[in-house]
């Protein structure tokens, strides 16, 4: 590829609509750039992006990691270049190829606690795969862990999602401060989701980050979720699609 891919990472507190907005970004990119290669990465162990995009996942990134580790532990010594080649092949083999985009899920490690190993692997995968795509959308893990561990180090656009709550805005303020030190992003902005009344907007305080869009409560999206339908079933004028479009336009992606 001749130009740098645009890698859009979406982060924020859990439960604020991060995954839904990530899915809306993917849909918009497929509509505006139908001839581009687009990759959606579900980097959240809560594994919701597949449902939001209508994708059935059979194998995850963590499945690949564990399989390769097991082959090293159980078999003869193998050269690092051989393992890297196998990992690259397996990753592409594991991708779900839809008509308009490709999809890869991080998965959910079976053991409780730290996701350090799979996050370290994810960082390498993002670097490995991004050169093969025009646009990459990453639905990040809730909170700050993946930012803190430099998993998102090379993203070009960082989009922080919050609701109007003070807890939500505090989380994205913290993510932004850490990202300023650890992420080599080109543009960063925030989306405030589920704004039930415009009168709330002056009371929402976000430090040092441009607000890209305020998205009101979206009854059509809530109904879509309840019915288990994908973001592609939402009307074009639904609040979440309009808000996502506004945000990507301000970031000069659309």
Question: What kind of region is each of these model predictions?
Answer:
Residues 7, 38-40, 101-103, 211-214:
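Conserved beta-strand scaffold positions in the cores of enzyme catalytic domains, especially
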Residues 243-254:
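C-terminal alpha-helix
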Residues 34, 117-223:
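Conserved catalytic-core segment of NTP-binding enzymes
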Residues 55-59, 178-179, 205-208, 230-232:
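Short, hinge-like loop/turn segments at secondary-structure boundaries
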